[in-house]
Curated annotation (Swiss-Prot):
InterPro entries reported in the protein's UniProt record: Serotransferrin_mammal (IPR030685), Transferrin (IPR016357), Transferrin-like_dom (IPR001156), Transferrin_Fe_BS (IPR018195)
Domain of life: Eukaryota
Cystine connections: 28-67, 38-58, 137-213, 156-350, 177-193, 180-196, 190-198, 246-260, 358-612, 364-396, 374-387, 421-690, 436-653, 468-539, 492-681, 502-516, 513-522, 579-593, 631-636
Source species of the chain: Oryctolagus cuniculus
Protein name according to UniProt: Serotransferrin
Expressed in which tissues: Expressed by the liver and secreted in plasma.
Length: 695
């Protein structure tokens, strides 16, 4: 009883215990200097924040890895990490994610990345491919610019065995300074800085330390970031004493780092738990902090500098913070190339340049029905196709970005999102021509379909009607009609404009999900009965007033062409098209009555896999394309038991893009402009994540 009473009195003295816990950010510091700055940070924020605002508690640990473990174990909440450690933090069992990113440059031109460079003294006579036997200066073991990037690039040049990695690096260079390395096991890594001190107290730790190692004549090359040069060499005369090593084995002046760098590296980020991570509270705290104590703010406390040392808690070169989009995990934040380099280092992978890597293509299938078709394709092709599953097109795009899948065919709206995420179009679906050697078709027609029995509806009086869409972010079903409506109504509240609708991919509580039938209600895949072209048309037949589809949809589902009970008795003449001038026309006159021309669906992949995907699909369509006479007895790429699985069913063949191998070239300027205008209405969390580093 006394213990309970004592606890209650303690809580009363400190304020409500639950409230303190919920509004407290426990910041992790890795040395005494960081702990001192953290205490100043805590006290300074207390002066400017309201009583119910976020509070800071400082937690000191011996290293960043200990901080990562502490956050995962709910013993701390946040720490700022180099990109290499962001990757480490994101791995199981830690499962942390970036929640706030530092940005550099200026408010007018902010950058959430920096360049990793190899800095040498002018007059030293060697190139990047001649580093063996030289002396090297690194920022720290496992850090991005100082270790992961350069060692990843040099990995296949290291002497075998390459494990342990530190031993191979020690044998490659004649001497090194690698802070945080184990000097007892790998003494050569600490030859230039005895002890390999692992904190900013040490003279050769971090960016400035690696530069000092080079400047003092200890090393021949320093692996740093471009800002390190300008921070430590303010005058051009001083900078002219140094050069950069380029990937093409040339040298350039240090001012030309954009053309001569080892890699583009994402900025340092604050990480938190993926679940119950307090990311909103952390952002509230840091956003207030940059307002009161950021760059160009007067006061005793400075967020991005410290009298105690360099780069404490945050990088001194940071200008401010951006909130990281919620969809962004560590892999999306770091990017495929960076993650691949780090993964190769971890797993000891060194590709054989003579080996044919194009053995199979892993296709991303949406939902149960697509996976069944993909599995059949995989068996039929003898394993040339492998299958990966995801619930939404965006989840598939993310899997392709991360290397968990290689390819899928997408509507133009998703091609736009995939392009913003770094993927490229590889082949286009052709719907009219079977001549697969010609250039791809110009596109198909996006139309608005209504029932003939409902004669009062026209393009100009759709407000208050019930709408049917293929899915949010798809071309004919969303981007084109909603883009046209946006230009007229000048707002994004489409769920208020239409009385009810089914637009798969909308928020579940939206009126644009009220007409959807499931079984996974409003899901952007075939588990929603009203998903896709046929689904949107069925929605019109059974519940809606207008359907936004492609011009062929009505023809493909009337006159007995679709034997399903809801469609078997439908006639083409039961439906009409809405024209933009307010008139209506028969569905056969789509060429004179449509909303816009839409780009054909296209197969997308990563740049590094594009050539393989293209060759495999062109080979496979020879055997399983429209040359197959009877799809009931043999697998057909362009035929589905339900509609439009993996590819559109009306695909005649896949065609080469003839140079239109970027999403901008493939989609065309007009379509890009239309989608860009609609972006302010976008609910795509993946698009938000993929455009984050394009500030």
């Amino acid at each position: 009883m006394r213990l309970a009473a004592g606890a209650l009195l303690a809580c009363a003295a400190l304020g409500l215990c639950l409230a303190v816990t919920e509004k407290t950010v426990r910041w992790c510091a890795v040395n005494d200097h960081e702990a001192s700055k953290c205490a100043n940070f805590r006290d300074s924020m207390k002066k400017v924040l309201p009583e119910d605002g976020p509070r800071i508690i400082c937690v000191k640990k011996a290293s960043y890895l200990d901080c990562i473990k502490a956050i995962a174990a709910h013993e701390a909440d946040a720490v700022t990490l180099d990109a290499g450690l962001v990757h480490e933090a994101g791995l199981t069992p830690n499962n942390l994610k970036p929640v706030v990113a530092e940005f550099y440059g200026s408010k007018e031109n902010p950058k959430t990345f920096y360049y990793a460079v190899a800095l040498v003294k002018k007059g030293s006579n060697f190139q990047l491919n001649e580093l063996q036997g030289k002396k090297s200066c690194h920022t720290g073991l496992g850090r991005s610019a100082g270790w992961n990037i350069p060692i990843g690039l040099l990995y296949c040049d290291l002497p075998e065995p390459r494990k342990p990695l530190e031993k191979a690096v020690a044998s490659f260079f004649s001497g090194s300074c690698v802070p945080c390395a184990d000097g007892a096991d790998f003494p050569q890594l600490c030859q230039l800085c005895p002890g390999c001190g692992c904190s900013s107290v040490q003279p050769y730790f971090g960016y400035s330390g690696a530069f000092k190692c080079l400047k003092d004549g200890l090393g021949d090359v320093a692996f740093v970031k471009q800002e390190t040069i300008f921070e430590n060499l303010p005058s051009k005369d001083e900078r002219d004493q140094y050069e950069l090593l380029c990937l093409d084995n040339t040298r350039k002046p240090v001012d030309e780092y954009e053309q001569c760098h080892l890699a583009r590296v994402p900025s340092h980020a604050v990480v938190a738990r993926s679940v119950d991570g307090k990311e909103d509270l952390i952002w509230e705290l840091l956003n207030q902090a940059q307002e009161h104590f950021g760059k160009d703010k007067s006061g005793d406390f400075q967020l991005f500098s410290s009298p105690h040392g360099k780069n404490l808690l945050f990088k001194d070169s940071a200008y401010g913070f951006f909130k990281v989009p919620p969809r962004m995990d560590a892999n999306l934040y770091l990017g495929y190339e960076y993650v691949t380099a780090v993964r190769n280092l971890r797993e000891g992978i060194c590709p054989d340049p003579l080996q044919d890597e194009c053995k199979a293509v892993k296709w991303c299938a949406l939902s149960h029905h697509e996976r069944l078709k993909c599995d059949e394709w995989s068996v039929t092709s003898g394993g040339l196709i492998e299958c990966e599953s995801a619930e939404t097109p965006e989840d598939c795009i993310a899997k392709i970005m991360n290397g968990e899948a290689d390819a899928m065919s997408l509507d133009g709206g998703y091609v736009y999102i995939a392009g913003q995420c770094g993927l490229v179009p590889v082949l286009a679906e052709n719907y009219e021509s079977t001549d697969c050697k010609k250039a791809p078709e110009e596109g198909y027609l996006s139309v608005a379909v209504v029932k003939k029995s409902n004669p009062d509806i026209n393009w100009n009086n759709l407000e208050g009607k019930k709408s049917c869409h293929t899915a949010v972010d798809r071309t004919a079903g969303w981007n084109i009609p909603m883009g046209l409506l946006y230009n007229r109504i000048n707002h994004c509240r489409f769920d208020e404009f239409f009385r009810q609708g089914c637009a798969p991919g909308s928020q579940k509580n939206s009126s644009l999900c009220e007409l959807c039938v499931g079984p996974s209600v409003c899901a952007p895949n075939n588990r929603e009965g009203y998903y896709g072209y046929t689904g949107a048309f069925r929605c019109l037949v059974e519940k809606g007033d207008v359907a936004f589809v492609k011009s062929q949809t009505v023809l493909q589902n009337t006159g007995g062409r679709n034997s399903e009970p809801w469609a078997k008795d439908l006639k083409e003449e039961d439906f009409e098209l809405l024209c933009l001038d307010g008139t209506r026309k028969p569905v056969s006159e789509a060429h004179n009555c449509h909303l816009a021309k839409a780009p054909n669906h296209a197969v997308v992949s990563r740049k590094d896999k594009a050539a393989c995907v293209k060759q495999k699909l062109l080979d496979l369509q020879v055997e399983y394309g429209n040359t197959v006479a009877d799809c009931s007895s043999k697998f057909c790429m362009f035929h589905s038991k339900t509609k439009d699985l993996l590819f559109r069913d009306d695909t005649k063949c896949l065609v080469d893009l003839r140079g239109k191998n970027t999403y901008e070239k493939y989609l065309g300027a007009d379509y890009i402009k239309a989608v860009s205008n609609l972006r302010k209405c976008s609910t795509s969390r993946l698009l938000e994540a993929c455009t984050f580093h394009k500030h």
